[in-house]
């Protein structure tokens, strides 16, 4: 997984230069480590996703995979400027439209 994130770096840097932000929404199958994950090997989150959230601060980090058997389980967690959402089954996010022009001004 780390390698896949590293391969994304050139595009993320380009986005920052052109649009003023690395990315708004990051969608994955697995969760970050210690955020909505479990301790068994199949449901353990990835540490590299925690690094990604700290470094690139997407507005939303959306993951699935972690089944919610109890409706009281936490499904949304705020990590600095990033909202981490367990979208297992379904989850509706209301995201504001952003107008971005070609020279990076919002």
Segments (PLM) and residue ranges:
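Binuclear metal-dependent phosphoesterase catalytic core
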Residues: 50-56, 60, 68-106
């Amino acid at each position: 997984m780390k390698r896949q994130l590293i391969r994304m770096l050139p595009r993320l840097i380009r986005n920052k230069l052109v649009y003023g932000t690395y990315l708004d929404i990051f969608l994955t199958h697995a969760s970050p480590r210690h955020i909505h994950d479990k301790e068994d090997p199949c449901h353990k989150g990835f540490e590299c996703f925690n690094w990604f959230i700290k470094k690139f601060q997407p507005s939303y980090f959306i993951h699935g995979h972690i089944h919610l058997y109890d409706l009281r389980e936490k499904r949304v967690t705020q990590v600095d400027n990033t909202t981490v959402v367990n979208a297992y089954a379904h989850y509706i996010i209301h995201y504001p439209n952003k107008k971005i022009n070609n020279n990076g001004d919002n």
